[in-house]
Design a protein with these regions (language model features):
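Conserved S-adenosyl-L-methionine
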Residues: 114-123
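A short glycine-rich, Lys/Arg-flanked "PGG" loop and its adjoining helix->strand segment in the class I
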Residues: 55-72
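Short alpha-helix
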Residues: 98-112
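A short acidic, Gly/Pro-enriched loop at the edge of an enzyme's catalytic core
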Residues: 31-44
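Short, small-residue-biased leader/transition segments that mark boundaries at the very start
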Residues: 1-2
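Short, glycine-/aromatic-enriched active-site segment of Class I SAM-dependent methyltransferases
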Residues: 77-94
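Conserved SAM-binding strand-loop segment of SAM-dependent methyltransferases
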Residues: 20-31
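Flexible, glycine-/basic-rich loop-and-beta segments that form/coincide
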Residues: 131, 135-169
Length: 169
């Protein structure tokens, strides 16, 4: 069974919408998802949210995943950093802000009952050119893992800089 949730509507491809394995929950804020809406415990979730911090999404997500379940989360600095750290057109260019965002993501994931198994940068920039990151989480007791966040941020900026400031490399 596949579940798809979106605060918007009419965005899910018809092929998926008409698949009986897909339950589409439109006009639904992920912060308030409950077991009544998603009665089956999920093995996996992919999270790509806008205009809201993952800090607010991870706790309810934990309640929907089965123990040992996994989630892939797109970490968007423009929605994690705070308004005062976001530049023109919603773009975060400062590597120090990216580093801070990733440190907070690790903390928020752990606080919400997840272990971060993997962390990398997305090879695809956001629409305005934002560098974004991907976190791979597992529900269960928090296990401390070490990531070289500075090296990750440096690599993301160096690699994606070679592809210009546009959306996709």
């Amino acid at each position: 069974m596949y579940k798809r949730q979106d605060v918007g509507y009419g965005q899910l491809a018809w092929k998926l919408r008409s698949d009986p394995r897909v339950v589409c929950l439109e006009r639904t804020n992920a912060r308030y998802l409950t077991h009544e809406q998603v009665p089956d415990e999920l093995d996996f979730a992919s999270v790509d949210v806008s205009f809201i911090s993952l800090k607010l999404i991870l706790p309810p997500l934990n309640g929907l995943l089965k123990d040992g379940g996994h989630a892939a989360c797109l970490v968007k600095p423009q929605f994690e950093a705070g308004r005062e750290k976001v530049g023109k057109k919603g773009v975060v260019r400062d590597p120090a802000v990216h580093l801070e965002v990733l440190e907070h993501f690790l903390d928020h994931a752990g606080d919400a009952g997840f272990t971060v198994l993997g962390l990398t940068y997305s090879p695809i920039r956001g629409p305005e050119g934002n560098i974004e990151y991907l976190g791979y989480l597992e529900k269960g007791p928090r296990q401390e893992r070490t990531f070289d966040l500075k090296a990750l941020v440096d690599e993301s900026h160096q690699t994606l800089k070679e592809h210009g400031e546009g959306g996709n490399p």
